[in-house]
């Protein structure tokens, strides 16, 4: 009878020790990779040169403020030097930034915003990497 009790205790202790070992492959993943996007993390200024059909590029500056207001400046490089400005409010939902008055959204990524197409999907193709606004906080 003692043998059964000792053996059961040994098996229990063995399982306890084995369960404490973390052998998962994702245990070394950087914690910042999966940080929940919050309003405070995206406040600042973003710059980028978006593709343009009939001009060299669309120089874009997007400023997001803490009171949920945004200012978006476009300059059509090589066409019209006057900036086109849009002001409104912004909303963050499930990692996507929606600017009031615009039909498209931005996907929030570390230190950048990636413009999505009108259906809310990532833009694909040769110019996909140019639909990015990078955080500069000027």
Give residue ranges: language-model regions.
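Short, conserved beta-turn/loop elements at beta-strand boundaries and strand-helix junctions
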Residues: 93-97
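Extracellular/luminal ectodomains and secreted, surface-exposed scaffolds of diverse proteins
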Residues: 88-90
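Lipid interaction determinants
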Residues: 9, 18-85, 98-138
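Sec-dependent bacterial lipoprotein signal peptides
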Residues: 1-18
């Amino acid at each position: 009878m003692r043998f059964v009790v000792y053996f059961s205790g040994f098996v229990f202790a063995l399982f306890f020790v084995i369960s404490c070992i973390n052998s998962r492959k994702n245990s070394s993943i950087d914690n910042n990779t999966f940080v929940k996007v919050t309003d405070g993390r995206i406040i600042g200024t973003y710059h980028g040169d978006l593709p343009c059909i009939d001009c060299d590029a669309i120089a874009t500056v997007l400023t997001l403020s803490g009171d949920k207001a945004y200012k978006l400046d476009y300059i059509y490089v090589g066409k019209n030097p006057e900036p086109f400005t849009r002001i409104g409010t912004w909303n963050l939902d499930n990692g996507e930034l929606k600017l009031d008055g615009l039909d498209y959204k931005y996907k929030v990524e570390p230190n950048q915003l990636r413009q999505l197409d009108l259906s809310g999907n990532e833009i694909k193709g040769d110019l996909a990497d140019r639909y990015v606004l990078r955080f500069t906080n000027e």
